[in-house]
Amino acid sequence: MTTLNADHFIAHDGVRVPVKSWLPVDRPPTAVVIAVHGFNDYSNFFAAPGDFLASRTVATYAFDQRGFGATPAAGIWPGVPALIKDLETVIALVRARHPGIPLYLFGESMGGAVVMVTIKKAAAENRKSDVDGVILSAPAVWGRETMPWYQTAALWLSAHTVPKAKLTGQGLKIMASDNIEMLRALGRDPLVIKKTRVDAVYGLTNLMDAALEAARDLDLPMLILYGKKDQIIPNAPTELMLARLPESGKADRKVIFYANGYHMLTRDLQGQTVWRDIATWIDAR
């Protein structure tokens, strides 16, 4: 039986999954957010915006996705179906705990991709997703159709010959954020994965393929956030995703581009601007 506890939830298969929450102190919440972290990250990614939203009477729950953080087998790619199932479970548990108020999904990077394919699954099953809207921050939609052929070929070869080999990303000279102090703290955090298996990168790419395709089915209220200085998810696949979103949902969709924004928008030096934009969008619902 799935249950939601103070610091974990029990998944459908009995796995104990860590959970963090940020709740309003002196008033009942007027809305609730489920925050889904990015690749190699974990639930603590939403600590600062979670505190901010709590001050605005918005409750937030975040959990370590399987294969990440303090979950069993951290570093091992769990597969897209497992990621979707866990998010579906958390949605049901949080909805049961907070009935009658709006529930939104926030997904950063890989978390955004998981949110997208979860909504797509509900549409494919001809059922309404039990959420009132989604917030996508630099969603991971860099699918193979927008990658150069040599990149996809090298990834396929590596995944099928040395799947357990680990990559560090050192030497790539990529900035995930302009908040250097925060990046250094992540480097010291033992729950942030530093060496990534090749087969996990392959699995992530499969997820990004699915997320880019899922854009066609995201017909619900949306807030999409993207930094023009993002060096992780290129502009081209992001623009392709935006072009694929259904015309029917355009009136209830807002896109914000941050001229000085990097990939980790909520943790950038201008992160508080992003938090306020999220809170304003939720308040206006």
Name each model feature, range by range:
Residues N40-S43, G69-P99:
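Catalytic nucleophile-loop/oxyanion-hole region of alpha/beta-hydrolase
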Residues D252-R285:
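Catalytic active-site module of serine/aspartate enzymes centered on a nucleophile-bearing elbow/loop
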Residues L220, P234-R244:
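Short alpha-helix in the alpha/beta-hydrolase fold that links the catalytic acid
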Residues K229-I233, M264:
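Acidic catalytic loop of the alpha/beta-hydrolase fold
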Residues M1-V25:
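N-terminal cap/lid segment of alpha/beta-hydrolase-fold proteins
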Residues G50-A74:
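Conserved alpha/beta-hydrolase
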Residues L218, I224-Y226, D230:
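Short beta-strand/loop motif that positions the catalytic acidic residue
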Residues M110-R197:
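Alpha/beta-hydrolase-fold enzymes
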